[in-house]
A protein has these predicted regions:
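Conserved catalytic core of nucleotide polymerization and phosphodiester-bond processing enzymes
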Residues: 1-425
Length: 425
């Protein structure tokens, strides 16, 4: 089923590739696929490294890691309650499922027995929202940070932001800065604040995520007696500054789309656009009228508050704040649609898809990876997202409306994505 932006969701709410780790771990493809050689098993190996958190190294190193841990996987397969190695993984339940698959494959491999894999293997986007925003404006530096460009090892924008935060803290002459440096500023502190940028993340949300990360990182051993509010507030200012310095084009796109949404709202119109697949996306954010009703329940009078949409009204604040995340979601939905269509044309019919993580059988992963890159490149070569929004606004809004033109594009060659091993990996 689809939402209004074209994003796709399984009808089943629990057993779904889009659910939590323990839910994904229970899923396998009904149709098995033979693993005939080491090439067919390559993405099964890489998937194992990924779910264990060994995903900041090259694909070759991930594959080597999996073969170095065959004995561990076999031990887990034989007795997962005693051998708890799988519990050390970033995604422990998917790691357990992988251990079972990897152990059976390697046991059979020794004797030349055929092995049919049923395990979905996934290739994950690198901060996918920022990948789309960087592609829209052809931002070369932003694109490099989120792996739109080829590189020998994966780039990590969360680490880039963390390094910039450290530089900013070193410039401060305050005890709080020294305390934070002593605790250590790492990618875990900056990951979630960076991830929410394409979705209109706020400074308040940034502070909350930093607070949670600090609590997890150093609860019971910190200079603040476990009072993490002040250090989180202090650090969030530098994280927010670093994000704005590292992620420039993304903010340009977001600010532009927000301004167009405000123009629509001022004229009492809902902001709308067509995605590259041709789907019309319309934001429907009405102003709300607050009402109160009284009713009887078990002999008592109960008063309930509720909100009712006001017809023919537009909530300008929600329209503006929702514009950027809804646009990005509509674009990742379009990219997924094009990818699936291309894969089906190649004979692939089994998918485990999230909007920033595409999965299928290990032997089919090379084809899936090729087609998802082709789909992304073709989508942005053939569709100028902001120009289309501008043209639509000029047509839809009142004559004489001063519609701002889109920001200028950078020098990124979008076809470089075709050769980027870590665009999705």
């Amino acid at each position: 089923q689809l939402d209004f932006r074209g994003r796709k969701y399984p009808v089943e709410s629990f057993l779904s590739p889009q659910n939590a780790d323990y839910s994904k771990a229970l899923l396998e493809f009904a149709n098995g696929m033979i693993v005939a050689n080491d090439d067919d098993a390559r993405w099964l190996a890489i998937h194992g490294a990924n779910v264990f958190g060994v995903d900041k190294v090259s694909l070759e190193e991930r594959e080597i890691w999996a073969y170095m841990n065959v004995d561990n996987a076999v031990s887990v397969y034989n007795d997962p309650l005693t051998n708890k190695w799988w519990q050390e993984a970033d995604k422990p339940w998917q790691a357990l499922a992988w251990c079972y698959e990897w152990a059976v494959y390697n046991n059979g491999r020794q004797f030349g027995e055929p092995f049919y894999t049923h395990l979905p293997c996934a290739s994950d986007g690198s901060c996918n929202g920022l990948q789309h925003l960087s592609a829209i404006l052809r931002d070369k530096e932003g694109g490099r940070a989120v792996n739109l460009l080829p590189s020998e090892v994966p780039q990590d924008i969360y680490t880039d932001v963390a390094k910039r935060v450290v530089e900013l803290l070193l410039q401060q002459d305050s005890q709080m800065a020294r305390d934070l440096l002593s605790v250590g500023v790492c990618r875990k502190l900056t990951k979630r604040p960076v991830m929410i940028v394409p979705y209109s993340g706020t400074r308040h949300a940034c502070t909350e995520y930093i607070k949670e990360a600090l609590e997890e990182k150093c609860k019971g051993r910190n200079p603040w007696n476990d009072d993490f509010f002040r250090p989180s507030m202090y650090l969030s200012g530098f994280v927010w500054q670093a994000i704005n310095e590292v992620i420039i084009s993304a903010h340009s796109v977001m600010n532009y789309v927000k301004e167009i949404a405000r123009l629509y709202a001022r004229q009492g119109k809902m902001f709308e656009w067509y995605t590259p697949t041709g789907l019309l996306v319309r934001q429907t954010y009405n102003e709300q009228k607050k009402l109160r009703i009284a009713t009887h329940l078990n002999g008592s009078v109960v008063r309930l508050n509720y909100s009712k949409p006001i017809d023919d009204s537009v909530d300008a604040r929600k329209a503006a704040s929702g514009a950027s995340p809804n646009l990005v979601h509509s674009l990742d939905a379009a990219a997924l649609t094009f990818t699936v269509n291309k894969c089906v044309a190649e004979g692939i019919t089994d998918f485990a898809m999230v909007h920033d993580s595409y999965g299928t059988h290990s032997p089919n992963m090379p084809t899936l990876n090729e087609k998802l890159r082709e789909a992304f490149v073709e989508m942005y070569k053939e569709h100028d997202v902001l120009q289309n929004i501008y043209d639509s606004a000029v047509t839809s809004l009142k004559e004489g409306t001063d519609v701002p033109k889109p920001p200028e594009k950078g020098q990124l060659n979008i076809e470089e994505v075709l050769n980027s091993d870590y665009f999705f990996a």
